Amino acid sequence: TPRTMQSGFRSSLTYAPEEVQDVLNKKIQEEERETLRHSTPVTRQLERDMHANIRYQKNVLKVVSLFSGAGGLDLGVKLAMLSCTGGAENSLTFLADRQNFEKNTKNIDFIYSNDIFPAANVSYTANFGLDVVKDSRDIRQVIEFPDSDLMLGGFPCPGFSAAGPRLLDDPRNFLYIHYIRALTQSKPTFFIAENVKGLMTMARGQVLKQITEYFSAAGYQVVAHLVNARDYGVPQIR
């Protein structure tokens, strides 16, 4: 959580990369201890059963999806895969026939999805099928995340959005730590983390810098890029 400016306070933005990594590792270890402390034998067994149901196919891109919602970001990744294999001009035509769409996206496999909202999980299952292992727990209750090649997630942004109050101390603004915790366990080759434009200007850009440093400290080369949904076939400026 945020700390107030006090005598002797040192902004973590002034830390050396090794110090940032040490701070991040300690924070992740702290969160993992809290997760275990609040778990029970029953919940731990349920998680083991969940992992046992995950299918790992060879020669496909295995995807873990966090804060999944109805799967909009996941669909975008599937369309991106189609753009690579069949050309960008043809990718949207596959949406007209679901059977053809699924046939041409067999080389990408969504193995696990996590979202706390029941309605979102129902929609996600309708969109992506029953083969995806759905986890409806709060991400802070997940002890271990499955291995993956790609991780997706649009972590919550109530304090980052221009459409609502910009609250630095909103606890939901710090769920990105659990996204990074998932990265360190799942060890994907690459990841996509989506958020709102307001994240780039909050606290004069210092929040984005901090988050970027943490993702970098987890062992990834990070590039922040602003896009507009209207440029990708969505009928809205977002």
Outline where the language-model segments fall.
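S-adenosyl-L-methionine
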Residues: 1-101, 114-148
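Conserved proline-anchored active-site loop of SAM-dependent methyltransferases
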Residues: 63-77, 138, 147-165, 190-196
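Short, solvent-exposed loop/turn and secondary-structure capping segments
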Residues: 75-78, 125-127, 162-164, 202-204
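Class I S-adenosyl-L-methionine
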Residues: 78, 121-125, 129, 141-148, 161-238, ...
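Short, conserved catalytic or adaptor-binding loops enriched in Gly and charged residues
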Residues: 99-106, 127, 214-217
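Short beta-strand element of Class I
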Residues: 110-111
